[in-house]
Swiss-Prot record:
GO MF annotations, alphabetized: nickel cation binding
InterPro entries for this protein: UreF (IPR002639), UreF_sf (IPR038277)
Family to which this protein belongs: Belongs to the UreF family.
Keywords, alphabetical: Chaperone, Cytoplasm, Nickel insertion
Superkingdom, natural source: Bacteria
Subunit organization: UreD, UreF and UreG form a complex that acts as a GTP-hydrolysis-dependent molecular chaperone, activating the urease apoprotein by helping to assemble the nickel containing metallocenter of UreC. The UreE protein probably delivers the nickel.
Pfam families reported in the protein's UniProt record: UreF (PF01730)
Lineage: Bacteria, Pseudomonadati, Pseudomonadota, Gammaproteobacteria, Enterobacterales
Cellular component annotations (GO), alphabetically ordered: cytoplasm
Subcellular locations according to the entry: Cytoplasm
Role according to the record: Required for maturation of urease via the functional incorporation of the urease nickel metallocenter.
Name the UniProt record assigns to this protein: Urease accessory protein UreF
KW Chaperone (keyword) present: yes
PANTHER family, sorted: UREASE ACCESSORY PROTEIN F
């Protein structure tokens, strides 16, 4: 695949129009707004930075790197182990349901784009979008760092768009938040990808509480 086609595939994977339901989950933000933990754009920036530093950098990205390398080796056993580890790190039923829902949606895309995708890999994709994205990146020969940039941007944009609806704040503030959060992401991405096994794990108890409480929140915009 040419460099131009790789870049275009990368932009497609980062697109907000990708039908995986990324804008239907708030990851606890809706309850955090309801209870008053997040009242404005400044509070949101603090909240999302915590999720980035203590969850995405310590769980999602390092496990994504391991999944990518497992796909390079065609090592289904290793990919299965890390997919299960990722799911175990999702601390609430809602977060695990989001992981599986996004995974199932992404699996449909992978099968449509790559009809000869091996049957042995498909159940792993259905458990986690990260596994499907890693496999597709290897198939399309997209470097891990480029794929990680796409993954991070998509995650941050989805979070900010949830904030626009819930906090709320305007589109100009949203773009400024995306800009600053992306700068923070770029600074920490390489270290997160190289994180050793002994340092894997999240530390976001408030986010876990918010997600658990959101499951029974009386009035909500986002799925649970």
């Amino acid at each position: 695949m040419t460099d131009a086609r790789q870049r275009l595939r990368l932009m497609q994977l980062a697109s907000s129009s990708l039908p995986v339901g990324s804008f239907t989950w708030s990851q606890g933000l809706e309850w955090a707004v309801e209870i008053g933990w997040v009242k404005n754009a400044e509070d949101f920036a603090h909240w999302q930075t915590q999720q980035l530093e203590q969850n995405f950098f310590t769980v999602d990205l390092p496990i994504f790197a391991r999944l990518y390398h497992a796909c390079e080796r065609n090592d289904v056993t290793a990919a299965r182990r890390w997919s299960a580890y990722l799911l175990a790190c999702r601390e609430t039923r809602e977060l695990r349901e989001e992981e599986r829902s996004r995974g199932a949606a992404f699996t449909r895309l992978v099968v449509d784009w790559v009809p000869d995708c091996p049957q042995t890999w498909r159940p792993l994709f259905a458990n986690s979008q990260l596994c499907g994205m890693a496999w597709l990146g290897v198939r399309w020969r997209i470097p891990l760092t480029d794929l990680a940039l796409s993954l991070g941007y998509s995650w941050l944009e989805s979070a900010v768009m949830a904030g626009v609806k819930l906090v709320p704040f305007g589109q100009q503030a949203a773009q400024q938040l995306i800009l600053s959060l992306c700068d923070h992401y770029a600074q920490g991405m390489a270290q997160a990808l190289a994180r050793p096994d002994a340092d894997l794990g999240s530390s976001t108890p408030l986010a876990a509480i918010a997600s658990a409480r959101h499951e029974t929140q009386y009035c909500r915009l986002f799925r649970s």
